[in-house]
Amino acid sequence: MKAEILCVGTELLLGDIVNTNAQYISKELANIGIEVYHHSVIGDNENRLLKELERAFNYCDLVITTGGLGPTKDDLTKESVAKFFQEDLVLHEKSLKQIEKRLLCFNKSMTESNRKQAYFPKNCEILENPNGTAPGFIIEKDNKIAIILPGPPYEMQPMFENKVIPYLEKLTNSTIKSKVLRITGIGESDVADLISDILERQTNPTVAPYAKQGETTLRITAKANSEEKAISLIVPIEKKIRQILGDNIYSSGETLLEEVVANILVKRNLTIATAESCTGGLLAGKLINFPGISSVFLEGAITYSNESKINRLNVKKETLEKYTAVSKEVALEMAEGIAKSAGTNIGISTTGVAGPGGGTYDKPIGLIYIGLYINGKTFVKELNYSGNRQFIRNITVTRALDFLRRNLK
């Protein structure tokens, strides 16, 4: 079965609202073996909606819409779908009573605008909406299926999970399962080169790399007639990829790098403190996102000036004068200084030139040093990046977390 997701709402086109519905529905459809061929976003305009429906059904069996089911005049999805399927809209008394009951919960009375929400194509299956006043519906005709859902995610998602998925599962006999591997320390092109044999020979499962800031994700996707069979197809490919990429894979699924690092620290009861210059607290902020980190994260210092590095971290004035603040020597003294000051097993530091100003020939914008102190041992890493200030700061935090992860292995 081929599907298109059609999200309706002028507010989406204007960028006032982020379209999370398409992402959610795509993932859910993939899990039950339905392939999504196209995403569309369209404003609240009946003629355009009709044209989009006609275009979509030229190559799809299934079109799922979200939005345009509200009580206002510009909510036209229901009317457009009814016209496309040549169906009259009729009042559904049960829905009318449910809408009225819902409105009473908010001390509101039924209006003609709300009454409009209780009209549906004559031949359709109505999907109750316990979270709002806009029921959805399913209409089938001439081998075409349209599933019409409300726009707000808190209304759409429960309806999709409880009503739409059971309906669709009866129509398909295949399952698609995916496994996501998260990779850092090497770029997308390096990943593609290392697993080129797998990428060139892929059929089922498929393997697709995706570049993100500071990391690459690999999605392994298998299609089979059962979940167990799909998983069994993924396992040998995943094993081979792990053998090739090794420690560059830091997690799978939704687990983020900071969560991996925080878990290691908590499980091994390793206390940590951070000393940041160019990242200005971003590194500490990432770590403290993790619940339970308070048992091991003792302190974070932002030491932006040379004076604060000397006074707060005990960085030697001579080191700063000889090597400058952007140097491996200062990064190491910062890491050791914060660890000893805070009394922690680990100290980690960042110093560099994030830009847009401050760069020199010897110390260009994007030159970064990460210092690391672990129970008396010191490590340092030099990085060179190009990009804007925010990118350089964010990538530095990612590399610092990964540097710590690898040295704790």
Curated annotation (Swiss-Prot):
<dbReference type="Pfam" id="PF02464">
    <property type="entry name" value="CinA"/>
</dbReference>
<dbReference type="InterPro" id="IPR036425">
    <property type="entry name" value="MoaB/Mog-like_dom_sf"/>
</dbReference>
<dbReference type="InterPro" id="IPR041424">
    <property type="entry name" value="CinA_KH"/>
</dbReference>
<dbReference type="InterPro" id="IPR001453">
    <property type="entry name" value="MoaB/Mog_dom"/>
</dbReference>
<dbReference type="InterPro" id="IPR008135">
    <property type="entry name" value="Competence-induced_CinA"/>
</dbReference>
<dbReference type="Pfam" id="PF00994">
    <property type="entry name" value="MoCF_biosynth"/>
</dbReference>
<comment type="similarity">
    <text>Belongs to the CinA family.</text>
</comment>
<dbReference type="InterPro" id="IPR050101">
    <property type="entry name" value="CinA"/>
</dbReference>
<dbReference type="Pfam" id="PF18146">
    <property type="entry name" value="CinA_KH"/>
</dbReference>
<dbReference type="InterPro" id="IPR036653">
    <property type="entry name" value="CinA-like_C"/>
</dbReference>
<dbReference type="InterPro" id="IPR008136">
    <property type="entry name" value="CinA_C"/>
</dbReference>
<protein>
    <recommendedName>
        <fullName>Putative competence-damage inducible protein</fullName>
    </recommendedName>
</protein>
